[in-house]
Amino acid sequence: MKAEWNTFPHLCHTPNGDISIRVYCYLPKGQTNELPILFYVHGLGGGNKDKGNGAEWLSTFAEEHHHVIVAPAFPRDEFPSEFYQLGTISASMDSYVPVAEEFWIYNNIEQLFDRVKGMLASKCETYKIFGHSAGGQFVHRFLNAMPDARVSRAVAANPGSWTFPVADGKIDDTGNVYGWPATVKDTPLADDRHLKSFFARKMLVELGEADIKSLKETYATGSGGTTFMNLPGMCAQGDCRFDRGMTYWKRAHEYAASRGFACNWELLRVPEVAHEGKKMFAAAIDWLLSD
C-alpha cells in the first residue's frame, strides 16, 4: 500500500448472507510497520461517504501523530440500525432474539486488524478505536460484546443511545427494568466475564456539552430505521445525547461498584461542542495519545 489513502474490499458475514464492504486505510509517509493503528468508525450514513466523511482531518492526524488509520465503510442500505449500531447481536431491535456470534458485526474489526497487520508486516499487538454518534454506539457495544478484542484505547463520542452494562436491567432509581437494547439483561453480554472485561477497558465516554437537541423529537417517527432510539429504555436515559451519556456514566459506575468490578473508564465533557464529529475527535486526541 502507498503512503496515502488506500482501499480494499472486505467480506462481512451477516445473518442475511455475505456482504462486501470497502475499507479505507491511510498510511502516513515513512516506515509504517511500527506505527500504532487507529480504527475510525463512522456515524449513521457515513458508510455511504468516502472514508466515512472524515478523510481530511483523519489524514492530518495520521501525518502529525504518526498513526495508520483504518476506516471500514458499512453502507446504510445494507447495514441498517440493527446491523450497525446494535451489532447484529439480536435479530430484533426491541428485544433480545439471539444471533450466532459468528454473525456479529464486531468480528470484522478484529479480522481487519489482522489483515492490516499482515499487509504492513506490522508489529502492533493492539489498536485504538474512535467512533462518533452511531459510531459511538458501535464502539461501546463492541467493547462489551468482545472481551478478547485487542483494543488499547477506545472513544465512544456522543452516542444517541447506550446499552447499559447492568445485568439487573435497571437504568435509574425508578425500579423499572429494561432489556435489550437498553441494557444487557438476559443476553450473553451480562455475564461476569463480559462485564469485568468491559469495565476494565480504557474507554473514554466523550460528551459534547452542547449536544442537547431532543432525540425524542428527532426520532419521533423512527426516521431512517432508528425506531429503537425512542424505545422506553432509551427514553429513560434522557432526552438528549448529553443527558443520556451522563446517565450512562453515573449508572455504570454505580453498578460496577456494587459488583466489585474495577472501572477504568474516563469521562470527557467538551464545552461548547454539539453533535460535531471533527471537533469531538480533536478533543480526544490527547487522550488517544496518552499511552
Regions found by a protein language model. Name each.
Residues 25-29, 58-60, 186-204, 285-288:
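Short amphipathic alpha-helices and their capping/turn segments at secondary-structure boundaries
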Residues 39-41, 157, 270:
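Alpha/beta-hydrolase
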Residues 42, 131-133:
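Conserved alpha/beta-hydrolase "nucleophile elbow" surrounding the catalytic nucleophile
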Residues 89-120, 127:
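Alpha/beta-hydrolase active-site loop
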Residues 3-6, 206, 218-233, 243-291:
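C-terminal catalytic histidine-bearing segment of alpha/beta-hydrolase fold enzymes
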Residues 152-254:
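The feature captures the conserved acid-bearing segment of alpha/beta-hydrolase catalytic domains
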Residues 31-35, 40-80, 163-164, 213-215:
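Short substrate-entry loop that stabilizes the transition state in hydrolases
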Residues 1-37, 50, 64-68, 94, ...:
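A domain-start/cap signature at the N-terminus of enzymes
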